């Protein structure tokens, strides 16, 4: 069956693979065919050889060879195009007004900024801040405010700084500052994570504004204004410095952060935190390859106090084109670190931010486009929006939602929030938090995160069902028993997953802290939980958690209340989770493509260990009945000898006594030995290093398995095409004989014979061979004649008498008990085999 269409719909948030080479094989119930260029959804990387994929969400998964495919970039549904009202398609001039307000209270404190960003000592203005729409505006002090208008000319999306540089009018300058002696020019430029556009046609270095004089982080995120002082055309450097009403803003030359060259310090979704050579932190997006000095806004818990805004009407807005370029941070309050009202926020298994509606259970994912703008798309890929949908809920629904989230507010200890700047905020859970729905969102570095006003309004941690400190140990993993090792771990219950980290550290959850990656995760779907018996642990307050993957945990706490709460919450979570069928379990993993590419027959596999699901407890009466039936079965079970006598069990070929094997096959030479010798003489006499080169042990074991189970063996099959596999199996047959071809009781006699004079050696060895059992004599004769033919083709295969003797000496001749004379015995073993090969006609006749 053909698997995928090249033009299939790309589902957002999925990981896809692309086929690089054609491949086909026979599965258990169908024929798998993949073609070059086809794409599939990656379900699981099972091992290094095979990956599990499926054509679409509703199809059955199957396996493809990992070497034949490649993983492609994760696709996401592109955001809808936002048209700006009145924006012409052709090149026209669009005037913008950036309204900068200042307070007259500090008119005598404004600093003078030269064109090189060095402060003078004249006057000082109020600092710029951002409102909820990420627009620049001044801090709000009571007093008279004056608008300073900057006219910007836009041409084909680029700012022209020749003839249309934004000018500060003399009238406005005189009214605002009173003593500015000449025209000033300010260029406002857009920057993004991935590129910086130059506004200076004269080639002067760009200089960025710093928002925080203490942190020194640049405004390098998307939709950020970059303000620079330039000289108008045909004029020299201005006689007087350029002034603007900006407070505590730094202008410095800076480049993009370097590419990461070391592992990430911290990972949050697709964003990684790194340090450069000077120890300064910067941020890198794995998906979009964006780099920035400033923490991404959508990942931070930015909060403000009540006093930051006295009047919402004082917020200054950018013009329509300004909003067009800065849509990524001007849409919803969910970008401030807390989800919008009516939505709950969590991370999915791939680290994406997932929003679930509290009213409709609809799921939406957040993504960032190539320009750094945030948008949202539904989990099924049918819709994409710049903002999350808004629902009008009744007061009763809101009360139920608030009640369901009340678990997080019962914490007795203070909550510690970790900021991106690694400073902390301690919240007292007994304090009443004022509503924050109407509060605008600010960058974190607008005010010190450790200031007292943040303690009242900082957002609470991400919604979680339960978390706390527990003692935990594994007693089984993947169905195998492991040694108990009790550890104190910080446990976090997230949906159907129970996560464990080392310690609480500086966060109430494993998100946002330095230990953001959990030590291990437990899937609660299909799990069982019960109080542990005394034979499992001597500790008190211990319960046992078993997963359907075969992992067994013991969880303990000295506090009775804590352990009872955890037991109730986990029991409730397990009961509410539906057990999903794993299609990958039912699908049999095929053999390695490089070895058995054309295999048309499936090898007989060992029975799989089926996963048991504990659906309901068994009554004690049923348990007694089961034990009784098992006892009856064991007592009536026939012995192994009786089964062999009836012919139900047959001895295997490998490891069987040579005489018994020949008797069972009604001959004096094993059929497998004849089969291997005939195949080698037909196909392998001219192979370089025949018998000296080892074959693939895994394939040799498969051949051994086929021989032992009386399967129809065809050595011409493509899966046995490697001649060294055949020779390796033949050597293994003689090596695994219970008694070697030269029997134990004659070993010392053969050693004494080889020590005699050269003329007497041949006769002594010949007499000893005649004393061996008939199957040993005949098998030895056919084997040595075959090895002699191999040596006769030595010009092609480069095998000599000595090299063959080294290979077969220890295999055919060995003492019953190894002693300290192993090296001496090896010399004699090789000499005996070499003598028989040289004197073959004298010993066995022609």
Swiss-Prot record:
Residue numbers carrying Phosphothreonine: 230-231
Stretches assigned to the PH domain: 463-575
PROSITE patterns: PH_DOMAIN, RHOGAP, SH3, WW_DOMAIN_2
Domain WW: 265-298, 358-391
Biased composition (Polar residues): 152-175, 191-200, 224-234, 445-461
Site (Arginine finger): 692
Domain SH3 stretches: 12-74
InterPro entries: ARHGAP12_SH3, PH-like_dom_sf, PH_domain, Rho-GAP, Rho_GTPase_activation_prot, RhoGAP_dom, SH3-like_dom_sf, SH3_domain
One example GO MF annotation: GTPase activator activity
Name of the molecule in the record: Rho GTPase-activating protein 12
Organism for this UniProt entry: Homo sapiens
